[in-house]
């Protein structure tokens, strides 16, 4: 797939993103009914997780080095959540659960972490030391292109919720044994920022992308855009909304 140029003013400008031409075509065609639920949608149905006005070949597929579990707050508005974008772009590696449903987390079989800030949270670069502390690292071999690469974790849990609703999930006893990982401070490009929140509060799809990028940089070879297409929809919508703001004189 060819790459689309992004606005230079955007933090998304250097991404290696598949062509947005199918999204441009779908936008011109307008909203359509979701074939599953019948609701009017554009690009995808955020309730059903189905493509709308697009064919599977129009959308890039991303292979991830770890499995991603997203626990969505039941009161999180579907239309404001970016979690479904991860599922559409990496369907083999991403699963979404609506709380109180959570995944089976067997720490005896897998190294699992929860991405959430806190006083005891570690950084991505500290993962290897943490999971190898007993001198017997449990490591799953991950194949990338022609190489077998080592990764200290196999599963990552994210919470999809506004910050003022996270306590209900983060305090669940089923998650208490999971070590926490905190991302480096980065500014969000999300256009639906929570009122009163700092610009370092990332959308779920941004958090997943930055975590995987950091993981790759620390434990694999040089990062060359392997997960950039996770922001395929996000970068297009960001560009679209910025254009609309500029046209309205609000940018």
From Swiss-Prot:
Predominant location: nucleus
Transferase is among the record's keywords: yes
Pfam family name, one: DTW
Organism domain of life: Eukaryota
Identification of the protein by name: tRNA-uridine aminocarboxypropyltransferase 1
Catalyzed reactions: a uridine in tRNA + S-adenosyl-L-methionine = a 3-[(3S)-3-amino-3-carboxypropyl]uridine in tRNA + S-methyl-5'-thioadenosine + H(+)
Subcellular location: Nucleus
Documented EC number(s): 2.5.1.25
GO cellular component, one term: nucleus
GO biological process assignments: tRNA modification
Family to which this protein belongs: Belongs to the TDD superfamily. DTWD1 family.
Function noted in UniProt: Catalyzes the formation of 3-(3-amino-3-carboxypropyl)uridine (acp3U) at position 20 in the D-loop of several cytoplasmic tRNAs (acp3U(20)).
Matches recorded under InterPro entries: DTW, tRNA_Mod/Golgi_Maint
SMART domains: DTW (SM01144)
Motif range (DXTW): 160-163
Molecular function as annotated in GO: tRNA-uridine aminocarboxypropyltransferase activity
UniProt entry keywords in alphabetical sequence: Nucleus, S-adenosyl-L-methionine, Transferase, tRNA processing
